[in-house]
Regions:
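Alpha-helical subdomain
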Residues: 2-159
């Protein structure tokens, strides 16, 4: 819920939906309510792999979600998001990237150790993300400039 609360703080007229695993969704619901944001965000508990994502959004975000999963599961998540977005809807992906501009070796080493410790997932290059996004039904894929390229790369894609 941290990304949602930050986005809502920046854009006063914005309304949001949050989808996360049920225990995380409950924590987010309580946190957002304590920040006075309950009236601007609808929280849904579920799993990308078992439940349909709620529809009705123009933009979906995946923030540090895909790098925890292998390609098969990452593609399943992207397909679920594509199914929930209307034609012309936008996906914003903020993830560690294997080819961080200006920090290739350092970023690859950092996330290599992180993912080794986690025992799963991987950082992907922009080309690898683009291939997964296309396979899930997205096009107009762009890499945006990030203020912290070592930690996060940002990609937009249109359904």
């Amino acid at each position: 819920g941290r990304f949602v609360s930050a986005a809502l703080a920046q854009v006063p007229h914005l309304r949001a939906m949050l989808f996360d695993l049920p225990p995380v969704a409950e924590l987010a619901r309580a946190r957002l309510a304590s920040q006075g944001l309950a009236g601007r965000v609808t929280v849904h508990g579920g799993s990308f792999f078992d439940d349909a994502l709620p529809g009705g959004a123009d933009v979906a975000t995946l923030v540090r979600v895909l790098f925890d999963h292998d390609d098969e599961h990452a593609l399943a998540i992207l397909r679920a998001v594509a199914a929930a977005l209307p034609p012309g809807g936008t996906l914003l992906v903020a993830e560690p990237m294997a080819d961080a501009p200006g920090a290739h070796a350092m970023g690859d080493a950092y996330f290599g150790f992180y993912l080794l410790a986690m025992g799963r997932g991987r950082a992907r290059s922009f080309a690898e993300f683009s291939a997964l996004l296309r396979a899930a039904g997205f096009d107009r894929i762009d890499r945006l400039r990030s203020r912290a390229p070592l930690l996060t790369g940002v990609i937009t894609a249109t359904r």
